[in-house]
């Protein structure tokens, strides 16, 4: 995670743009997912049985890109031109340009719906993979997230794991000053989710929570 942080900060400095705060706050969980949890292979990025990942808070691309590169999907040199004209790495990552990306991002509020779609598609095709969706507390002031949460519960999509970056900040300021979303744990529980609050910079807590979610799906 420390290496990815350095790459992210360097990319922001070079292109003089980006969303460093919301990117740096997710690098620990991205590191746990890619380097410990997810079944993904840079040599076979389109493996139909791979786990899926959706970066719903797509503006964290300057943090996601370094992880993708460090894991071997793309050469790290590509980050040297992050968000510059002609670069494959833009402010939002494009799955048609970056290997290892399951879906492109853009407008906030749609990632969990995409994750539900991945899970339902796998069920129809008889495939059993995990789907991880990383969202943020600021993003959760959009109602489409809660419609997607209701859908996941309705169809018992236990292989969908929602990871909320509860950093309490958004581009307009503090989340509570814009739209209060807490208590997030009680809200998700009301929709039928099993919820665990952890320290987002504690690798063990993150790993244990994700492993619990996987075990819950398998059981």
Named regions from a protein language model:
Residues 1, 15, 49-50, 133-134, ...:
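A short, structure-level motif marking secondary-structure boundaries and short turns
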Residues 2, 6, 23-24, 58, ...:
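Electropositive phosphate-/nucleotide-binding environments in soluble metabolic enzymes
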Residues 2-17, 165-167:
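N-terminal capping segment at the start of a domain
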Residues 11, 23-147, 153-154:
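Cofactor-binding active-site loop characterized by glycine-rich and histidine/acidic residues
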Residues 18-22, 45, 198:
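Short, surface-exposed helix-loop/turn micro-motifs enriched in polar/charged residues
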Residues 20-23, 134, 163-166:
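Conserved alpha/beta enzyme-core scaffolds, especially Rossmann-like or related mixed alpha/beta domains
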Residues 84, 88-96, 114, 118-120, ...:
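Thiamine diphosphate
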């Amino acid at each position: 995670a420390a290496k990815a942080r350095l790459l992210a900060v360097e990319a922001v400095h070079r292109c003089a743009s980006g969303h460093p705060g919301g990117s740096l706050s997710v690098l620990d969980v991205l590191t746990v997912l890619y380097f410990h949890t997810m079944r993904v292979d840079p040599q076979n990025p389109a493996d139909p049985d791979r786990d899926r990942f959706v970066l719903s808070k797509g503006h964290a691309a300057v943090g996601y890109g370094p992880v993708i590169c460090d894991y071997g999907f793309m050469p790290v040199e590509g980050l040297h031109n992050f968000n510059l004209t002609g670069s494959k790495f833009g402010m939002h990552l494009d799955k048609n340009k970056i290997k290892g990306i399951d879906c492109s991002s853009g407008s906030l509020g749609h990632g969990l719906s995409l994750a539900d779609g991945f899970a339902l598609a796998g069920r129809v095709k008889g495939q059993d993979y995990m789907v991880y969706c990383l969202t943020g507390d600021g993003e959760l002031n959009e109602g489409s997230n809660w419609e997607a949460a209701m859908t996941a519960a309705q169809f018992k999509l236990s292989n969908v794991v929602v990871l909320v970056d509860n950093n309490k900040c958004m581009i307009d300021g503090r989340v509570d000053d814009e739209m209060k979303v807490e208590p997030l744990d009680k809200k998700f529980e009301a929709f039928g989710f099993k919820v665990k609050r952890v320290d987002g910079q504690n690798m063990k807590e993150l790993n244990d929570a994700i492993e619990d979610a996987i075990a819950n799906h398998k059981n």
